[in-house]
A protein has these predicted regions:
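N-terminal low-complexity, Ser/Thr/acidic repeat segments characteristic of secreted
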Residues: 31, 176-182, 209, 347, ...
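Glycine-rich phosphate-binding P-loop
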Residues: 31-52, 197-198, 206-232
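An accessory alpha-helical subdomain
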Residues: 121-178, 297-345, 349
Length: 356
């Protein structure tokens, strides 16, 4: 899919719990390599070894960032091969192991006696992390409910037929026929993390045509983007579809690599975009007098949602600390020779193509 190096997320906390697209990512590649049986430390070393080899050989690499740990990888892809940390909660499945999916197992790469001796500590940290993550999910679900109430309030004074008409006009202007069968690639440009809602702008920077939909409440942008996606599919274009990390049923961004064109949503969590993009204020399809009447309620809900989001970030920090403690124990129990063998095997697999 990638014509240049690019970075995305593939999963993270959303309303209702964890939501990921790792299976969809693995299914895009001829040779999915699943790294099983360990925590982020072991899988991270394998992924980094492969990334460095591919970068040194001048290959374009798509890296998948970890939403739980800044600076760590969850997966990467290059040509027909991808590598995925397949531990929970990612857990893509090997349907035809060895025939299709290649599996790298970390189970034998740890000192069993050491881990058994740390069983109680590992259990305590794991349970603590799970409790914190569930608490974060509850806070996020409550915040999403308030944001949804705002969206519904704005929808009552929004003319969706005008939004659809705008989507069709944008499609006519920016989306040309490709004459092929396009594919939809599910990715995330932002994720809910312990540091807030993080946004990855690198994939947007080289885009030649950027259209920003200013939509604070998410009432119109999703409708416009759905129309654009439908027209792009009919015209055979490849699509990178980026849902909202908080409310996965809502589209936030669409990227069309073949056209170097993107339509993105701007709100308080990601409002700054590079260059001088065209900006469309979605209030143009809303009745402004209706928005003014509801302004006080909208502000109150938004303020309460922000307070709940602060609790989300705090709970995710607790969950992250617990996970780091577990990772540290597993990292100390690694058998270096076994990890090195897995890294070498991963490098061999990175040279496979669709014909093998």
């Amino acid at each position: 899919m990638q014509a240049r190096d690019c970075s995305f997320y593939l999963g993270g906390l959303s309303c209702g719990g964890y939501r990921g697209y790792f299976q969809e990512f693995a299914d895009e590649f001829s040779v999915p390599v699943l790294i099983e049986g360990g925590f982020s430390s072991g899988a991270g070393k394998i992924l980094e070894a492969v990334r460095q080899q591919l970068a040194q050989s001048g290959q374009c690499v798509e890296t998948i960032c970890c939403s739980a740990y800044a600076g760590k990888l969850d997966a990467l892809g290059c040509k027909g091969v991808c590598f995925v940390n397949a531990t929970s909660p990612h857990a893509p499945k090997a349907v035809l192991p060895t025939a299709v999916e290649q599996v790298l197992s970390l189970y034998d790469a740890y000192d069993q006696k050491m881990l058994v001796s740390k069983r109680e500590e590992l259990t305590a940290w794991t349970e603590s992390g799970d409790r914190a993550f569930r608490r974060a999910a509850r806070y996020l679900t409550a915040a999403a409910s308030l944001l949804r109430e705002n969206e519904q309030a704005v929808l009552t004074c929004t003319d969706l037929s005008k939004a659809e008409q705008l989507g069709r006009a944008l499609a006519k202007r920016y989306l040309r026929e490709n004459g092929a069968n396009g594919r939809v690639h599910m990715r995330l440009l932002s994720a809910v993390t312990s540091d807030g809602i993080r946004f990855l702008p690198d994939v947007i920077r080289p885009i030649e045509t950027l259209v920003v939909l200013e939509d604070e409440y998410g009432a119109s942008a999703d409708c416009i983007l759905r129309v654009l996606q439908q027209h792009a599919t009919e015209r055979g274009l490849d699509i990178i579809a980026c849902p909202c990390p908080v409310r996965p049923k809502h589209l936030e961004h669409l990227i069309f690599p073949q056209l170097s064109t993107a339509f993105v949503t701007a709100n308080r969590y990601h409002s700054e975009y590079p260059g001088n993009p065209r900006r469309i204020h979605c209030t143009r399809v809303s009745e402004k007098s209706g928005l003014r009447v509801r302004r006080a309620r909208l502000r109150f809900n938004r303020k309460m949602a922000e307070e709940l989001m602060a609790q989300v970030f705090g709970a995710l920090t607790e969950a992250g600390e617990a996970q780091k403690a577990v990772d540290a124990i597993y990292s100390a129990a690694e058998i270096p020779e076994q990890i090195e063998k897995l890294c070498l095997r991963a490098k061999e697999l990175s040279s496979l193509d669709a014909g093998l």
